[in-house]
Structure formats: C-alpha cells, structure tokens
C-alpha cells in the first residue's frame, strides 16, 4: 500500500504527456522532449513505474546517458522516487566497457579483460608514432591529427579496417588513413589497450559473431532507455538496436532540434528514422517548457521551424509574461563586447541578476578575446570555459601512465610516456631501438626491453636505468595485489622520483602540479580497486562536462559547451552571416550544414530562462582582417512583435556617459 501511494505521489507531479510516457511500458517508445520539458523527470518516473509494477527487476533495466554526471543524477532520482538501487545506469562507454570486461576473450583478438582504455592524447601519440615509421607519407599533407579524426569517424560508423568499402577510401587521404588504421589497431591489440571507439565497435562485433552472447544481454536488459538519442553515432545506434531487437522494450528520449554534434559523429538520422527501425512505435511529444519565458520560446520555435528535416513540435509555457528579446546592432566586435560588458555591469549593479547567472555564448572560440579585454577593463569577474580539464593535465597523465604500466606491462603508450620522466638517460635513439625490436618480433616494448637487456647493447647508464625501472614496475605490480591503491600510488610517486623531480623544481608551476597530484590521490582513496579508478578516470576524460557551480563570475563559453545548461540571462553575440551561420559549415555541408547551424541557434536561445540578448556587428576582426557583414538570417526568422531592436550607441547614450 505504501509503495502504491508513493507511485501515485510521483505520478501526480507529471503533466498529462509526461504521465503518458511514464506509464508506457510495452513496445518501442520515442519521447520527443523539447528543451526544458522535464525529460529526466519522465525517464526516472518511467524506470520507477516499471519496477513498481513488477515488470522487471532493477538489474533487468538498462538506462544509457552521455555523461557520468547525467548517469549519477538519474540514479539518485530513481533512488529518491522509490528507494531503489541496482538499475544499470551509465554512459555508452561505461556500459560497453563492462560487457567487454566479461566477454573480451570471445572475440579471439588476443585481448584479455585487464585491457586499459587510452585517452584521446595517447591515441594521437600512437598515430604520430606509426606515421613516423611510414617514410613515404607526406606529414604536411596528411597530418597525424587529420588521420586520427578519420579513424575516429570510421569507428563512430562501426567500421573496422576490414569493413571499409571502396567509397570509404576514394580519396588519397582516406587511403593513407586506412593503412595507418590497420597498424593502429594492431598496436592497440599488442598493448592490450582499447580506445573509446573500440568499446562500441568491439561490442557490436561480439554480438554479431556470438548470437548466444547477444541473447544473454537481451535477456538481461529487458527494458532499455536511451537519453539524448539525437546525439548517438552509428555504432551506438547499432548497439542499441541489437540489444532491443528481442523484447523491443526500448525508450529513446531526444530532441532532433538539439542535434548539434554532427562534427563529432552524431547522426541526427537515428532519431528521425526511429519509426522505420521500430515498427508500431509510440511517439509522445513533450512540449510544455518549464524553463523559459514565452518570448524566448516563441523566438526558438520560429527559428527552428525553418528546418525541413525535423519532427514537428512547438514549445509552450503556462507563463504568459516575459521580457522581449533584445536585438542590438553594433558598429564593431569591440563595441559589441563593450556594450555587453556595460549591460552586464548595469544588470548586476541594479541587483536584477547575479553575475553567476549570466552567460555569453559564442559560436566560435575566436570571439572570446574581445570579451576578455572588455571585462578586464570593467573589472567584471568572468570565466572562460575551455581550459585543460583535470585528467588532461600533464602531471595527472604522467601518474596515470605509471599506474597503467604497473597494471599492464604491455601498455606501450604508458611505458613510452614515463620511460624518461624523470630523466633516465634514455633518449630517442634508445627508444627507437626498443620500438624497432618490438615491431620486428610482434611483442610489447616492455618484453623487448627485457630481451634487449640480455644482449648488452645499451650503454652502462641506460642499461642500469632500464633495469632499475623494470624491477620497480614488477614490484609495483605485486604491490597492487596486496596493498590499497592509495598506498601503492604513493609508493610509485616516491620510488619513481617523480614527486622529487617536481619538489626540486621549486617553481609556482611545479607547486601547482604537486597540488593537482594531491587532489588525484584524494580521488584514488575513494576506490578499493585500482582498475575501477583507471576506468573511471578514462571515462571522465571522455565525458567530463562543466559543473554548474558558476560562483560570482560571468560565464563565457561556446554554444556547443552550453548544451544542457541554463542561465537567467544569456547574451548571444556574433549573429552575422559567415560567423553564425558559420561560412565553413555552409561551404562544406550546404543545406545539411545550415540546418545544424540553425539547431545550434535553437540551443543557444533555449539556454535563457528570463532575459535574452542577441547582438551583431557591422564589422568584425577575424584573423587580422576587418570583415564587413550582414545580420544573421536567424535574426530575420524571429518575429518583430517579440523583439526590441536597437543599436548599441542608443543604449550607451541612454544608460552611460563616456
């Protein structure tokens, strides 16, 4: 009786369409959830309802998100609703990694379940190393970075080297990338490591080649829920389809109008063809917005309605009031920045808004410089989101490499990162000898060093350093078996000389690096198993998002980074043809590119809760050139009756004296 009342209580908080989605329990469901319509609330209510109706046990439900933060929030909400843990909630990568840990040997690739997941930077390093060995490749024309991007896109599409078709390798660059891709995969397998693309790629291979394993997971995950479906790539889409093909109890939640990650592999077609993929699917639209005012929603709807390839939906709100959209014309980008800085200063001084609830969302990174100057001049606290994230910092990656090589001695990338840090008299020549020896014999660098040490070809100093390092790595491996992760990592820091190296440097930078390592140790202390920490750090590096603790500073960030966030006041600068929509997107992708740009505009508009400013400049300095431009076509798509259009100089004359 208590459970039933609790069920009724949380259902009572849902609107009619939300309730319809939460009560839907059989067959495929596409939940089209517009910005600010409470999709997480619906997802968690649906999970709670399935459990309370005894349709599935918690561990038979799989909920997939794109970030660790979203997964954690979803898990906490389910627990708060029905006091239940045990639902499988995680990111695509974490769920795929979990399956591979249990099943990797069934792929017969020589991998074992102790594999490690390498970071984006380590992936690029490996590509660079392979390209260096290919003397006939023009690295100026075919850069390692570009080759790596192509390899990553192929993985997003679920394509191993053997599955690339003639159309995939039409261009000379693609043919070069295919050669590197083949070597890249071989190197990963030898090192017993995977990159992020491999997690879904090999999951799909596992399911295709082993129908009985697929059947096991289909039985295990009888109810599947996928958040942000519009952001899925082809590999993720295939994975979800295979898992759901038996019971067809799949609920995909998304908004095609917010699909803005095409440049990194997201395929908006996945959500647009849901009804074809799952015949007889139920479609429910969430259109009641709980975030923004009526004028903001009207602006967003009028802009996005110009896209042809979309599911029709219109956001609405019970709130009839709200400030009109301010559209401001400025003479230059400098004046635009000065106007925005002055307007924010006015809003804060008059105590209408707190600085931490104000954001400037730009289309491209080059736009931020003028705002930095304007805020420095006005003494307005601000932060630009986009610096190095914690797990990407040099010292953190060094310590992670030490841990990885201690756990997996075949991890070539980890070994090469730390082999001469601190200095051990092991230069490029010695490293090349090791690499060549290993490649010729199809063995890892660690094994190669052991064999080479027997030959005596290294100089005495290098010989002693390498012998000492290998002995320590063996000792650390043994210590991880018997001691706690935190104690072993402290030992590694001391034994390796890494901590001493930083302490002896005695600079502010070195002090900051030591502080970061101490913070890392605090994170490690929360884990009983070092493998769990390594996996956690790898997945965080891939999925880390901005924490919503803005303090007292104005936030400056890109529109892409702002997705999923909200602010009381939003400024959208640079709404000019060529800047937004981006000329590059128009040139490269035509109408498809324009529609993605319009979706980015829609995302920007719907970040605002109460007040929205859109600015454009008649001239802008772009890469040392003054460019004259016209207002963005997106501005013309916003109805006049919900806007106040003026120039920055008029505003200056009204509010400020210069």
From Swiss-Prot:
Transmembrane segments: none annotated. Keywords: ATP-binding, DNA damage, DNA repair, DNA replication, DNA-binding, Helicase, Hydrolase, Isomerase, Nucleotide-binding. It catalyses: Couples ATP hydrolysis with the unwinding of duplex DNA by translocating in the 3'-5' direction; ATP + H2O = ADP + phosphate + H(+). One of its GO terms (cellular component) is DNA helicase complex. InterPro entries: ATP-dep_DNA_helicase_PcrA, DExx_box_DNA_helicase_dom_sf, DNA_helicase_UvrD-like_C, DNA_helicase_UvrD/REP, P-loop_NTPase, UvrD-like_ATP-bd. It comes from the Bacteria. ATP binds at residues 36-41, 291. Residues 294-564 form the UvrD-like helicase C-terminal domain. GO terms for molecular function: 3'-5' DNA helicase activity; ATP binding; ATP hydrolysis activity; DNA binding. Pfam families: UvrD-helicase, UvrD_C. Its EC number is 5.6.2.4. It is an enzyme of class 5 (isomerase). GO terms for biological process: DNA replication; recombinational repair. NCBIfam families: pcrA. Has both ATPase and helicase activities. Unwinds DNA duplexes with 3' to 5' polarity with respect to the bound strand and initiates unwinding most effectively when a single-stranded region is present. Involved in the post-incision events of nucleotide excision repair and methyl-directed mismatch repair. This is DNA helicase II.
